Design a protein with these regions (language model features):
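Acidic/Gly/His-enriched mid-domain segments of enzyme catalytic cores or analogous surface patches
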Residues: 62-67, 98-99, 105-198
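Glycine-rich anion-binding loop/nest that anchors nucleotide
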Residues: 72-77, 183-184, 198-215, 229, ...
Length: 276
């Protein structure tokens, strides 16, 4: 049974070709990715109890499969309007009855609205330690540009029980490589092998346009225009999710966003409300 779920997640999709393309396109340093992986791995080794990745993955899977509706929250400009509309029309119990997964800074809004967070998927640049501690599970990603943040969150990571480390380099005993590039699409590559036929996926605040939502970074007061690098990252995220569609095999809906691809189902906020 050792590493059964780790192997399941890592083998469910073949992401290496995507990774090579991304590294070449952005001129990323492979060695820095490995260095970040090793930093996070050493931090996880310092946990005072015996850290068992497989047990935490099993716990996450069991929690994830208890509910029919899965809400994945991105940091796009439609996030706040969408969440507030759902709260006003369907009430907080709607979110209480969903699996709520936040891409990085989207956790800020969910915490402000006192919405339970089942998991944050984060490279740590969009959340505070307070956001970190409010989630049931935290999936921390190590890459070449966040080594300083890994050190900043070191004690928080050590003291947090239900934590899963991810890397885009070769995996280790303590870290998993689920594929994915941005926090938003990495949520889907991470959960795709856990999905059940009766479940449905709702992507909220995932707009993939040239406006970046204010919740993408702590202390932002308003949305802002994406720079060329950010825009290219969002386009990759969109392409990766499109590529995942045949592997997801359950209904997936983008909520309250403009049509960006023929491969997705779209729901206005009113249409979303009518489903429930």
């Amino acid at each position: 049974m050792k590493n059964l779920l780790k192997n399941q997640i890592e083998s469910h999709i073949e992401f290496s070709e995507w990774y090579r393309k991304i590294v070449n396109d952005f001129s990323f340093d492979l060695q820095k990715d490995r260095e970040a992986r090793d930093v996070l791995s050493r931090i996880l080794e310092k946990k005072q109890y015996s850290y068992n990745l497989e047990e935490i993955l099993l716990s996450f899977k069991e929690n994830f499969q208890k509910k029919e509706h899965i809400c994945v929250f991105g940091c796009g400009p439609s996030l706040e309007e969408s969440v507030d509309f759902i709260l006003s029309n369907l009430g907080k119990n709607f979110f209480n009855n969903c699996v709520n997964l936040a891409a990085d800074g989207a956790a800020q809004l969910l915490n402000e609205r006192i919405i339970p967070i089942d998991g944050i998927i984060t490279d740590l640049d969009g959340i505070t330690k307070r956001d970190f501690l409010k989630a049931k599970y935290v999936i921390v990603h190590a890459h070449g540009d966040n080594i300083i943040l890994l050190e900043h969150f070191k004690n928080t990571i050590i003291n947090f029980t239900k934590i899963i480390g991810t890397t885009q380099a070769e995996s280790t005993q303590y870290l998993i490589n689920p594929g994915g590039f941005t926090d938003g699409d990495r949520i889907l590559t991470f959960i795709v092998s856990f999905l059940l036929p009766q479940q449905e996926l709702y992507l909220i605040g995932m707009d993939f346009n040239d406006i970046v939502g204010k919740y993408s970074k702590p202390n932002n007061e308003k949305n802002y225009l994406a720079d060329p690098i950010k825009l290219k990252k969002l386009q990759y995220a969109l392409q990766i999710i499109e590529w995942l569609i045949p592997k997801i095999k359950i209904p997936l809906y983008l909520i309250n966003t403009k049509k960006i691809s023929d491969k997705f189902n779209y729901l206005t906020l009113e249409a979303f409300k009518e489903r429930f």
